[in-house]
Amino acid sequence: MEKMTIKDVDLKGKRVIMRVDFNVPVKDGVVQDDTRIRAALPTIKYALEQGAKVILLSHLGRPKGEPSPEFSLAPVAKRLSELLGKEVKFVPAVVGDEVKKAVEELKEGEVLLLENTRFHPGETKNDPELAKFWASLADIHVNDAFGTAHRAHASNVGIAQFIPSVAGFLMEKEIKFLSKVTYNPEKPYVVVLGGAKVSDKIGVITNLMEKADRILIGGAMMFTFLKALGKEVGSSRVEEDKIDLAKELLEKAKEKGVEIVLPVDTVIAQKIEPGVEKKVVRIDDGIPEGWMGLDIGPETVELFKQKLSDAKTVVWNGPMGVFEIDDFAEGTKQVALAIAALTEKGAITVVGGGDSAAAVNKFGLEDRFSHVSTGGGASLEFLEGKELPGIASIADKKK
């Protein structure tokens, strides 16, 4: 899938309206984690170096289509100014004369950030009037917000109906790596899935089963599969209404010759909190009532490492346990290290967004994978083989 990028257009003196993903945690008016802001810097800097006038659009949180002070982007403008080393002008409005005036006064090489796009009810409804207003401010639309690519909103899809839309560098990288692992992975291809819910991963399992050689399953979702196989899972989290589906997926994998690898042991405790009594049990011995599995055990870590050892392509989506608590983080950490080691051997390794990306950051391993996706829901939908509206709306490269 070849999309036009910011490098394919002349930006000198042009007004560029850029959809970025600045949906970052803010507390007491201070940005707590600026990973997403940093991720957008290469595209913003490139546009400025080319002599563009840059207008930035982003959402933050889930305001109900009206202004709400705790979701203001003002703290983001401040942090972006520090990271860019230059003033970022900020307009506390999304539409209207104040916005028009600020854009008219913008000079080449200057940046303007508008207020949270979701302060307007038309954003999430992809309202053509709102999109038309934003498009009227600029000559070119740059879409660098992969995190919202699975949503058809006014700021990413709507504007593209009125002015040409091209991909920013971050979007380009997401498309490149996710396309590779979804459509033409080098084999052996191993998929590692975790997280709480089987229901979130059904589409991914079904789609990647067509290409994968092995699928390793950890995280709380493993207990739904283990229960489907008749194992005793104690008080572990199980999606009772998905047990039959888990059986079907295991059958389907067998038919397709895909090896599904489930944990052989687990770290259990009676409560999900730090410092509680914990022990390791083998899955075949069963988990006692009142205890729940909160991480994969050491034998499973070794098994997973062995199943990963020859992989040329790895996709990892979802943690192996409750990694936020150190007592239950070891499984996730060891799997992350094993996948990182494969990157050094030349394998393509892609970490899906959301919790897996948070885990990788927690262990300081973010630079040791081919690609760590910035989009949770968007990366899942891409891996499911769906067409994402926020990518479809970007102009295709001319053949």
Curated annotation (Swiss-Prot):
<comment type="pathway">
    <text>Carbohydrate degradation; glycolysis; pyruvate from D-glyceraldehyde 3-phosphate: step 2/5.</text>
</comment>
<keyword id="KW-0808">Transferase</keyword>
<dbReference type="Pfam" id="PF00162">
    <property type="entry name" value="PGK"/>
</dbReference>
<feature type="binding site">
    <location>
        <position position="36"/>
    </location>
    <ligand>
        <name>substrate</name>
    </ligand>
</feature>
<dbReference type="GO" id="GO:0005524">
    <property type="term" value="F:ATP binding"/>
</dbReference>
<comment type="similarity">
    <text>Belongs to the phosphoglycerate kinase family.</text>
</comment>
<keyword id="KW-0067">ATP-binding</keyword>
<feature type="binding site">
    <location>
        <position position="201"/>
    </location>
    <ligand>
        <name>ATP</name>
    </ligand>
</feature>
<feature type="binding site">
    <location>
        <begin position="59"/>
        <end position="62"/>
    </location>
    <ligand>
        <name>substrate</name>
    </ligand>
</feature>
<keyword id="KW-0418">Kinase</keyword>
<dbReference type="GO" id="GO:0043531">
    <property type="term" value="F:ADP binding"/>
</dbReference>
<protein>
    <recommendedName>
        <fullName>Phosphoglycerate kinase</fullName>
        <ecNumber>2.7.2.3</ecNumber>
    </recommendedName>
</protein>
<feature type="binding site">
    <location>
        <position position="118"/>
    </location>
    <ligand>
        <name>substrate</name>
    </ligand>
</feature>
<feature type="binding site">
    <location>
        <position position="293"/>
    </location>
    <ligand>
        <name>ATP</name>
    </ligand>
</feature>
<feature type="binding site">
    <location>
        <position position="324"/>
    </location>
    <ligand>
        <name>ATP</name>
    </ligand>
</feature>
<dbReference type="GO" id="GO:0006094">
    <property type="term" value="P:gluconeogenesis"/>
</dbReference>
<feature type="binding site">
    <location>
        <position position="151"/>
    </location>
    <ligand>
        <name>substrate</name>
    </ligand>
</feature>
<feature type="binding site">
    <location>
        <begin position="353"/>
        <end position="356"/>
    </location>
    <ligand>
        <name>ATP</name>
    </ligand>
</feature>
<dbReference type="InterPro" id="IPR015824">
    <property type="entry name" value="Phosphoglycerate_kinase_N"/>
</dbReference>
<dbReference type="GO" id="GO:0004618">
    <property type="term" value="F:phosphoglycerate kinase activity"/>
</dbReference>
<comment type="subunit">
    <text>Monomer.</text>
</comment>
<keyword id="KW-0324">Glycolysis</keyword>
<dbReference type="InterPro" id="IPR001576">
    <property type="entry name" value="Phosphoglycerate_kinase"/>
</dbReference>
<dbReference type="InterPro" id="IPR015911">
    <property type="entry name" value="Phosphoglycerate_kinase_CS"/>
</dbReference>
<feature type="binding site">
    <location>
        <begin position="21"/>
        <end position="23"/>
    </location>
    <ligand>
        <name>substrate</name>
    </ligand>
</feature>
<dbReference type="GO" id="GO:0005829">
    <property type="term" value="C:cytosol"/>
</dbReference>
<keyword id="KW-0963">Cytoplasm</keyword>
<dbReference type="GO" id="GO:0006096">
    <property type="term" value="P:glycolytic process"/>
</dbReference>
<keyword id="KW-0547">Nucleotide-binding</keyword>
<dbReference type="InterPro" id="IPR036043">
    <property type="entry name" value="Phosphoglycerate_kinase_sf"/>
</dbReference>
